[in-house]
Curated annotation (Swiss-Prot):
The protein's role, per its UniProt record: Cleaves peptides in various proteins in a process that requires ATP hydrolysis. Has a chymotrypsin-like activity. Plays a major role in the degradation of misfolded proteins.
Underlying gene: clpP
Protein name per its UniProtKB record: ATP-dependent Clp protease proteolytic subunit
Organism for this UniProt entry: Histophilus somni (strain 2336)
Family matches, as PROSITE patterns: CLP_PROTEASE_HIS (PS00382), CLP_PROTEASE_SER (PS00381)
Similarity section: Belongs to the peptidase S14 family.
Top-level enzyme category: hydrolase
Lineage, top ranks: Bacteria, Pseudomonadati, Pseudomonadota, Gammaproteobacteria, Pasteurellales
EC code: 3.4.21.92
Keyword terms of this UniProt record: Cytoplasm, Hydrolase, Protease, Serine protease
Amino acid sequence: MSVIPMVVEQTSRGERSYDIYSRLLKERVIFLTGEVEDRMANLIVAQLLFLEAEDPAKDINIYINSPGGSVTAGMAIYDTMQFIKPNVRTLCIGQACSMGAFLLAGGTAGKRAALPHARVMIHQPLGGFRGQASDIQIHAQEILKIKQTLNERLAFHTGQSIEQIEQDTDRDNFMSAEQAKLYGLVDDVLIKR
């Protein structure tokens, strides 16, 4: 069981308490933490759409600390980030691995950053399927299509060639914040505000 801190605000109408994440959402900050999965993706997408409706001209900030997870859940978040009008700033706090790194790179160009001791990891998508040989073949073809799509989007966001992305994602590829900047996954390493 996790405890979520509460924040108390004084207003002209008295005190009002919020959980910390709701309070930060008022400041256009979204936390993408933990495994990327369908329920979390739906919450992130809803927050992105809500903030766009509130003010389509104002940046949205996504703080990422994720080991990665589901490709389809991650693509729901990614597609929404690309679809909405506001610029989406991404910031890696802790780690952005696998789909977390993909979402980090998918922020608005020039507005993607990592904290100095953050770790970023890219690799090819993982798959596992059991069943009849024909079904295994279908799933293998699907994961190869997904791999191609992810590589194309990473190449677009980083400026690396598809061939370089394919080589660098063949195995787990861990990077420091500075290495992620040199690679093009982020634009800046933030030391202080």
